[in-house]
Amino acid sequence: MNKIATAEPEREPENDRGQLRSEAASETPAWSSSALPQECAKRHGWPSRLRSYFILAPLIWVYTVVLGTISLTLSFLDRDGGLQHKFARLWSKLVMKTILSPVKVTGSTDFDNSKPKVYAVTHASALDIPILYVYLPFQFRIVFKSELLAYPFVGWHLKRSGQVCINQQNPAASIGAVKSALRSLRKGMPLVIFPEGGRTPNGQLQPFLPGAFFLAIKAEADIDPIALVDTFDLLPMNTYHIKCQSLEVRVGDPISTAGLTVRDTDAVSAKVKSAIESLQSAPTSKSL
């Protein structure tokens, strides 16, 4: 009977393996997983906290109060929100310069708004808003939840600048807002919508609500998926500790809703979520 020969791999001499291990250890980059906790502790320890609490956060509040007051005063002269958008963009530029976090925009960045357009954006941080105002180079309106109206200056600005308020607890009360959003889309004003309905509490993508896709289908608007990368680490919920770092805005290809009906809402939602997950899982750009 013929025997089947099995080849046993050659074993490296013990001293060679030890040399390989030592060489590999010497080549371990500073950002590797073994070095990351210590590196993070150095970068985002107490000096970082003190800078956030006593410099960055107070400066942001000063920008908010001063520019918010001017914007609210001028809102009585400009009812369509165009002037308020410019003030929001100025405020956002000051915030982004203050937090020392460079941003790179990648992907489909031609931003063709010649027809109705909805931008479906991930939401992990309060600083997502200034990032969008700085790096989306056009006028847009944001669909926001009614709870934000309780915040001084921020809520007042949202109410006076033509943004779209949705009451998630009482959808019937939002019928007027939905009609307003549809009118804005059909007139060519792009809408920015956070399909998760709010900030993620853990950095993971949350289930999508149907509202964004209902609006897009009714207006026959294209949907551009956008993933904001590393903003959860920058400033998660329930803290004022801003961890200055490089960020990325990844823009996906437009998803058409032409010829679809509201029965296709779930399918469109799944398609957009899949596109955003692909954007999030792409390798991080090194050239920030």
What kind of region is each of these model predictions?
Residues 2-43, 47-50, 175-288:
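Non-catalytic C-terminal accessory region of glycerolipid acyltransferases
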Residues 100-102, 139, 160, 188, ...:
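A generic structural signal for alpha->beta connector loops
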Residues 39-104, 156-160:
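A transmembrane-helix-recognition feature enriched in membrane-embedded lipid enzymes
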Residues 35, 39-40, 52-59, 88-144:
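Conserved H-X4-D acyltransferase segment
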Residues 92, 163-167, 197-198:
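Short, basic, glycine/proline-bearing loop/turn elements
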Residues 124-180:
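Membrane-embedded segments
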